[in-house]
From Swiss-Prot:
Assembly and interaction partners: Homohexamer.
Protein name: Uridylate kinase
Compartment list: Cytoplasm
Enzyme Commission number: 2.7.4.22
This protein's pathway: Pyrimidine metabolism; CTP biosynthesis via de novo pathway; UDP from UMP (UMPK route): step 1/1
Function according to Swiss-Prot or TrEMBL: Catalyzes the reversible phosphorylation of UMP to UDP.
Entry GO CC: cytosol
Reaction catalyzed: UMP + ATP = UDP + ADP
Species in which this protein is naturally found: Azorhizobium caulinodans (strain ATCC 43989 / DSM 5975 / JCM 20966 / LMG 6465 / NBRC 14845 / NCIMB 13405 / ORS 571)
Length: 238
């Protein structure tokens, strides 16, 4: 695929991004908009994998407590990601692009179990591959799962969709002096304890020499722009 800086991408979408203006769950017009952007990236020539979080339904680390152990809570969160992936799969197919949901937690009556080689075949055949269930293990975030799947699937970059247009020196919502990085290394992201992704995700990306492109999902066309190496982004790279 000549001319594309990232021929095979993994897009990480938070569960909260699917809420739109809703306080909980899914906002169908927002899901449809994100699906159209994924289809546009595919039409550009990129092979597209997607990891979706589950925070719009349940976040395991938040609900774990005295009466609910962390492992059980995390597995509940993984199931939430399956629901989100199925919704996004339907929206991608409604936008005219074949899609497949694959889950790290086997549930064959609902979707395919995740395995590396079948996932790569789906990508080569032009399908948008939605990766549900996180890593399949508790105590790992979907950000870490996204970097893991990107490394496994030989992706050229992780496109991390957030609510802000890149990585800042501090939270721009609370600190008016915060400035945005254009570029930063994995080592710097770890040393500065930046919260846009967890440390395990940055460390794994460093080990795999995998760039992470951070951008705002709220900006129309941002996924396609980031896939082309354009737009208002922060690049986290070796």
């Amino acid at each position: 695929m000549p001319g594309l800086p990232y021929p095979r991408i993994l897009v990480k979408v938070s569960g909260e991004a699917l809420m739109g203006s809703e306080p909980f769950g899914l906002h169908p017009p927002t899901v449809a908009r994100i699906a159209r952007e994924l289809v546009a990236a595919r039409e550009l020539g990129c092979e597209v994998a997607v990891v979706v979080g589950g925070g719009n339904i349940l976040r395991g680390a938040r609900v774990a407590g005295e009466d609910l152990d962390r492992s059980t809570a995390d597995h509940m969160g993984m199931l939430a990601t399956v629901m989100n992936c199925l919704a996004l799969e339907a929206a991608v197919e409604a936008a005219g692009q074949p899609a497949r949901t694959m889950s790290a937690i086997p549930m064959p009556t609902v979707c395919e179990p995740y395995a590396r080689q079948p996932a790569q075949r789906h990508l080569r055949r032009g399908r948008v591959v939605l990766l549900a269930g996180g890593t399949g293990n508790p105590y790992f975030t979907t950000d870490t799962g996204a970097v893991l799947r990107a490394a496994e699937l030989d992706c050229d970059a992780v496109l991390k969709a957030t609510n802000v247009d890149g990585v800042y020196t501090a939270d721009p919502k609370t600190d008016p002096t915060a400035t945005r990085y254009e570029r930063i290394t994995h080592d710097q992201a770890l040393a500065y304890d930046l919260k846009v992704m967890d440390a395990a995700a940055f460390a794994l990306a460093r080990e795999a020499s995998l760039p992470i492109i951070v951008f705002s999902i709220r900006d129309p066309g941002a996924i396609v722009a980031a896939a082309q190496g354009e737009g208002r982004v922060t690049v986290v790279s070796p």
